[in-house]
Amino acid sequence: MYFAIRLSFVLAVLICLTGNGSARMLDADRNRLQQLQIRSQQSADANTQVDIAYEVIGIYDKYKGQGGSNVLREAQLNSQVNDFKRKTMVIDGVPAQGGVWGILGAIKKAADAVPDNVKKDAENLVKSSTKVLVRGIYDYLMGKMKH
């Protein structure tokens, strides 16, 4: 009997510690998402935008598919994330199948041949599409983390 009481006490403590750890992780991820969203809105650099997007995607991957998920919205976000990853994937410094980096790389290599307004338009496209992705994931996760 003494062993059963002691074991139940130990299990109760472990459950409390695990729950508290999850709450801290949730708070940390929520705070990090807020920081990344602010940085995304303030940054004017395409490379920084892509780095921010990958970090936000990492947080999204931790929480997608969990209880209270909106299956339709997650399917849309998953499609956007996969499209983004496909277009920005770099393997050994080389863009996979062109993508965004192929566009930017081609622009950088042929900098003298490409007008400045075309270079600027390509960078603006990268920045705006990345901001839209970050904002979509941010809005979804912040709504989900309130519960």
Curated annotation (Swiss-Prot):
A Gene Ontology biological process term: response to oxidative stress
Entry's induction text: By a variety of stressful conditions such as bacterial infection, heat shock, paraquat feeding and exposure to ultraviolet light.
A cellular component term, taken from the record's GO annotations: extracellular space
Signal sequence interval, chain numbering: 1-23
Statement: the UniProt record of this protein carries the keyword Secreted: yes
Cellular location(s): Secreted
Xref: Pfam families: Turandot
InterPro entries per record: Turandot (IPR010825)
Keywords, comma-separated and alphabetical: Immunity, Innate immunity, Secreted, Signal
Predominant location category: secreted
Family (UniProt): Belongs to the Turandot family.
Function: A humoral factor that may play a role in stress tolerance.
Protein name: Protein Turandot Z
Gene name of the encoded protein: TotZ
